[in-house]
UniProtKB/Swiss-Prot annotation:
EC number: 2.7.4.22
Species of provenance: Prochlorococcus marinus (strain SARG / CCMP1375 / SS120)
Catalytic activity: UMP + ATP = UDP + ADP
Superkingdom, taxonomy of origin: Bacteria
Sorted UniProt keywords: ATP-binding, Cytoplasm, Kinase, Nucleotide-binding, Pyrimidine biosynthesis, Transferase
Family membership noted in the UniProt record: Belongs to the UMP kinase family.
Entries under Pfam families matching the protein: AA_kinase
Protein name (Swiss-Prot/TrEMBL): Uridylate kinase
NCBIfam families linked to this entry: pyrH_bact
Gene assigned in the entry: pyrH
One Gene Ontology cellular component annotation held by this UniProt entry: cytoplasm
Keyword ATP-binding: yes
Amino acid sequence: MSYSRVLLKLSGEALMGSKPYGIDPEIVQSIAQDVSKVVQEGTQLAIVVGGGNIFRGLKGSSAGMDRATADYVGMLATVMNAITLQDGLERAGVETRVQTAIEMQQIAEPYIRRRAIRHLEKGRVVVFGGGCGNPFFTTDTTSALRAAEINADVIFKATKVDGVYNQDPKEYPEAIKYESLTFQEVLSKEIAVMDSTAIALCKDNKIPIVVFNIFQPGNINKAVAGEKIGSRISNSG
């Protein structure tokens, strides 16, 4: 099966590439080229981007910052990534709009659900920045929320690994990859795919998740076409 409307979740770490911090312009351009091909084929695409390559709220709070304050700083980091991604996409010929959950009128549109859907219908990519606008919620939860709001067929979680494993494959070469899982299995086994709030939202709204390696060129296209890559999580597995 192929998908007509997709929510792509990009972690901030994915934008780092092999760098220890910040944004790798080559990675941004590679992602932009893949997105361009998908959009040209008629798929509607929205993106939620994280901010962990610049600042992570949980780390800030563990270092003594007030948790809500740290989360707001993390939200600003996601906006920086969103604007950078917009620049890369538009240089690749993809008409793009950034919408933020916290109003920043000089640099982005405020998040308005109906406007976001209208942009998608016109063939524009919509990049959501600022998380969901509230502290204590991750960008994974934002992905599940926005996917439900825009009636996305699926969430693509683009990561540094080629799927979901029972252990970290970088530390444990013998780690076993899951081809498919149910939401209930992810919750009961506490498998680290997304936080439990995000998984529960996807479960309740019947939005499948496909986890795959973003650094493999063409993987976004393959996932949109319904090819079997990475790991799939759904109500039925």
